[in-house]
Every structure is written in structure tokens, then in C-alpha cells.
Amino acid sequence: MDRVTRYPIFSNPRSARVTSLVLDEDTSYTVELVGVGPEAGWSQGDLQAWSTEYQTRPDVKRTNVSSNRRVFLGQQSPRSLYLEDEDEEIKSYHLDDSSDTLCRQRRELEAERWAVIQSQAVRKGGTVATLQAASDHGDLRIARQPQSTVTEEILVDTEQIDFLAARQQFLSLEKANTNPVPCGLTARETFPRTPPGINQAPKASTGPHLANGYTTAVTSPMKEVTLEKSFHVSPARSIHIVNDPGSQTQAESPETPKETPIEREIRLAQEREAELREQRGLGRAAGHQELVQIPSRPLLSKMSLTETPPRRDRGRPSLYVQRDMVQETQREEDHRREGLQVGRASTPDWPSQDPQPGLQRSLSSDCILSPDARATDPAPEARKVNRIPLDAYQPYLGPGTPKLEFSAFGVYSKPSGVSTEDTKATVFQKATESPRHVSESSGRSLSSKQEWSKPPGKATNVGVVRLGNFHLRPLRFKVPDVPQGTETPHTWGWEVAGGPILRLQKSQSSDLLEREMESVLRREREVAEERRNAFFPEVFSPVPAEDESHEQDSRSSSRASGITGSYSVSESPLFTPVHLNSGLVWKVEAPEDSAPPGQKTRKEMWYAGINPSDSVNSEVLGATRVKRHKNLLAERWEAHIYASEDEN
């Protein structure tokens, strides 16, 4: 009954009924058997399925069903029953002599309280599956041996709202909505059930079967039902309900776990997405492809004392930033590979060849581990690495140091038996035999690299760098001297010893974009040069034309050969420090009539992106500067005039 309006809420005779407490014969545990009537929304003419299990069980007492919550043993009921079917007879048979009623009362109240707590705690997770129950009439007759009987009145507390019945009714309605009955069945199939009770009887084989604290009956003699029709379960977990009561073990639940509405929405969305992907011919979205491997800092034992730690290890971004960067490069690679699969040779599918697809993208050429870190690993297939390869470092290594081979992992391995030059030469010959065009730039750079590199002498642990190696010849990645219109398409070429020859061609759009960027940058440099020469002819000496074209050639050709990396080139064509990742600054040999060193300091005196040597910028800066307005007293104070003559 509602506490405010005093209307009976669950006075429906078809609502949930609870039987009296039953005492097991062999033990002193109490067993509460609960029978539930048909739910409020179900029709009268529904077909009901009754369990015949109770007729065969000799150890349960005969009871009638009433809708009580509290049990008074050995007393008369202080109230009358409020049920509509008041002609119902209430009988109760005790098992053994009830001498100590007080202890039993206390035990029964504890048991009832424990049952309520258990039912709420287990039901809250939504993982326990119980069979939905039904009964048309009030009495569930259960055969049992005749014993000495004591009749007792059972009280219905009309002041309390039956929250348990309300919860069960709500759950049954929700189940009826979410799990519709298959259309082949005319009436609803109902299963007998004894919801939350306590079953601590040691004879688990004869008693009702336990499923996570629930006593459930598992047989339905009217109809054999398979639950595969109305549940989305895998065939390995589908459960058949058969007429053998011993077939259901205690571990199995008689029904698959219910699916919450949110889970159902997620599942439907995933199925929809999979169908759409199938229609569009896309592969299924695999979450494991997004798992990438991020290299951690090398241990102190891996680092040798002769080399400084790589620049990336000094100020390394956080793990999340690294993961995003690696994932982005991975997506770009996959996208490029998918686009290149039609008509051109593409990089092979990684999952079939290499079990670790994340390493190639995250390790780069400046992560210098010990040379034997990955010497045992097989050389991987080619990958684009956006760093300067080791060949760019070769002229600066002394002739006594061993030449390290560069693999696409970005990890240096020890030189193998075949010398680097031989492998490069064979790779280049194979590449020229392939039907694709190879740009002349890679050929020239290769030949120049082969001029620079000398056969490895005896390996020494001390890296000897000669002074002559610091005088850097201008980087000879020159584009061939052909007009812009007839330029051959840029190609990326990776030479990996023992790997397949793969040439990845740039797409036309990125090629055009790069050309446009180059022309814009070139025009900007020319304009800045003209401006400097116009305003400061005495500081900036005119540049020899051949050097300028040579410098621009080398810079654009390094872009053309795909070697774009973390090195910066200053804007002056005379004085070009190339910042490599080793922390040293390699400088191009300046011509004899080079600019005075004041130019470098002038370059470094930039503030807020404004070049102080640019007079146009300076004029704009001066025109937009706001004068600071001071009043007369402040100006006098700053001029150290603290007293006026008038006051004297």
C-alpha cells in the first residue's frame, strides 16, 4: 500500500506470491521456496507450463501459496489476510519438533534478510540469468511424506510496499520487451521458477539447482524449448532445456546473460558498421592495427661513452604524443599502400611477413642503439623513414671506423661480410633493370656516396674523426640540369641488403604541391636577397651566380631524393650550417670572399620573427610603436627634479 495515498499497489491477485519458509529434513538450514504468479501484463488464456519435478521429490513439504513477506512461526496471526481470494486455505506442515521457536524465528528473519540482500546484489549486475516464472492459481501442491503438522497463520504486512515484487514485475516487463517470443510460438512459453531464496541443502542433486544464489527449476514438461531462437549467443554457449532434471549442472546457468539496452545498441551499431564496410568493399576495421610500439629510452648499458645521447632522447615528447605520431605515420603508410596496390609495386602486407608492424615506423635513424642491438634480426622490407639515412653521415666517419649498414628500421647493424658498396651497386643495377623510371638524382647521389665511402678497415672502438672530414663538400644530391617541364618524376628508393627492390612513386598531386612550395620558397629567397642587396650593399656582397644555383640545386635535390629530415638550413646561400642530429654543426666551406661573421649574429638577433636587417620591417615597427604618455610630474621625477622652484 502506498504510504501517502493508502491505495493498494500490489493488490492484484496475479502479482508475485511468496510461500512460507520450509525446513529441510536433514539439516537445520532454512529453505525459502518462492512461487511467482503470472505477471500483470499477461493474458488469462496464456498457456502455462508446470514443473513435474516436485511430484518426484520426497524431501519438500506440502504448502499453499500466499503473498506474505513476514513469517510468524508458532503464533496466531495478529491481522487478517487482505487477499481477494480469501477462501484460500492456508496450511503449513513442519518437519521436526519446533521446540525452540525463538531461535528459529531469529534464524528465519536472518535468512529472509540475507535472501533480499543477495537478490538485490546479484540482480544489480545483470549477469545472472533466471528463468521467468508463471502460475495461474494460488496453490502449488508439492507431495511429501506425512509428518506431525502444526497449522500456523501467516501474516501479510499491508503497510509495507513489496519492493521485491515490484522489481520482479519490472524486470519481467523489460524482458518481454527486449526478448520477443519467436513468431512460430502461439502462446508465451513460461518456465517455472523459484526466485531469490536460500538453498544451502547439502543434497544439491535432488534440490532445486543453484545458479549464482538462485534456486531455479529447469524442466518444462509441456514443451521442449531451445533458447537459441531469442538470444544472440554463440553456438558454443547455446543451452537446450530438456526434460532430464539431472542434465543441468550447477555451474551452468539455465539462460544466457541478459543484454542491457546499451550493449544492444553497441552491438547493433557494430553490426551496421560491418555491413556497410562489407557493402563498400572495405576490410573490417581491426583494432589491433592501431597498436603501435614506441621505443623507450635505451639503457645506460646500451649507450657507449664516445657518443652523445641522440637529440631525441634529450627532450622526448610524452608517450601519448609519441603514440599519436606513430599511429599517424602508420595510417599514412597503410593509406599509401592501399593506393599503390593498383598498377604499381607496393610494399608487402605486413601481418603476413613481420609480426611487429609498429617498430618500423617508430624507430628512426637518430635512435642510435648499440650496433649489435638488432644484428640478429633479419633485414625488414623497405619503409619510408623521414630522417637522414646513415649514408649522409658517411663522409664524416673516419676511414678506420666500420661502415654501418642502414636498415629501414633506423637501427644500425654491424657490417656484414658483403661490403656496403657491393650491395649498393647490385641493388642499383637491379633497380635500373626494372621497367620503372629511376631519377638521375638517386644515381648521382649513389655514385657520389660510393666515391666518399672507403672499404672498411680494421674495426676500432674509438671513433676517429679527422679534421679534413669537417670540411663538407656541398651535399651532392643534385637534380639533373634539365628544365622544369621535362623533369622526371621523383621516386623514393630504399636499398636494403637482401630485401626486395621496391620503388614507391610519389603521387602526382603531392609532386605538384612540392614543386609549388619550392617555387614559392625560391621566390621568397630571391625577394629577400634583392631587398638586402638594395638596403645594405656594403654588408651583403653580391653572390657568385654559380654558387647560388649550386646551393639551390643541392637543397632542392635533397628534397627530390626523399631525404627530408630534422635539419635546418639557414637562409643565406653563403653560410649554411646543416644541423644534424648528432649535436655537431656541419658547415659548408665558405668561399674566400664570404660575408663577415656579423651577418650570423645579425641573423641570431631576430626578435618575434622580425628581421632587424630588414628596413621595411623596421619602418613598420617604428610606425606602429605607441608613444608612452607620461604626465608632467612623472617626467620631472625621472629627471631627478624633486622640488619645484615655486614651492621654495
Curated annotation (Swiss-Prot):
Cited Pfam families: AKAP2_C
Renumbered to this chain, the Basic and acidic residues biased-composition regions fall at 255-281, 325-339
- What GO terms are given for molecular function? actin filament binding
One Gene Ontology BP term is: cell division
Q: Which residues carry this modification: Phosphothreonine?
A: 149, 190, 256, 347
Q: Where is the composition biased (Polar residues)?
A: 349-367, 440-450, 557-568
Protein's cellular compartments: Cell junction, Focal adhesion; Cytoplasm, Cytoskeleton; Cytoplasm, Cell cortex
Phosphoserine: residues bearing it? 77, 220, 253, 318, 352, 364-365, 439, 507, 509, 541, 554, 644
In terms of superkingdom, the source organism counts as Eukaryota
**Modified after translation how?**
Phosphorylated by CDK1 and PLK1. CDK1 is the priming kinase for PLK1 phosphorylation. Phosphorylation by PLK1 is required for proper spindle orientation at metaphase.
Q: What is the protein's major site of localization?
A: other
Key words of the record: Actin-binding, Cell cycle, Cell division, Cell junction, Coiled coil, Cytoplasm, Cytoskeleton, Mitosis, Phosphoprotein
Q: Name one GO cellular component term.
A: cortical actin cytoskeleton
Q: Where is this region: Disordered?
A: 242-383, 430-460, 539-568
- Which cysteines are cross-linked by disulfides? none
Q: Which residues form a coiled coil?
A: 511-534
Its job: Plays a role in mitotic spindle orientation and mitotic progression. Regulates the distribution of dynactin at the cell cortex in a PLK1-dependent manner, thus stabilizing cortical and astral microtubule attachments required for proper mitotic spindle positioning. May link microtubules to the actin cytoskeleton and focal adhesions. May be required for directed cell migration and centrosome orientation. May also be necessary for proper stacking of the Golgi apparatus.
Subunit structure, interactors included: Associates with F-actin. Interacts with DCTN1; this interaction regulates DCTN1 distribution at the cell cortex. Interacts with PTK2/FAK and MAPRE1.
Name the family the entry cites. Belongs to the MISP family.
Q: What is this protein called?
A: Mitotic interactor and substrate of PLK1
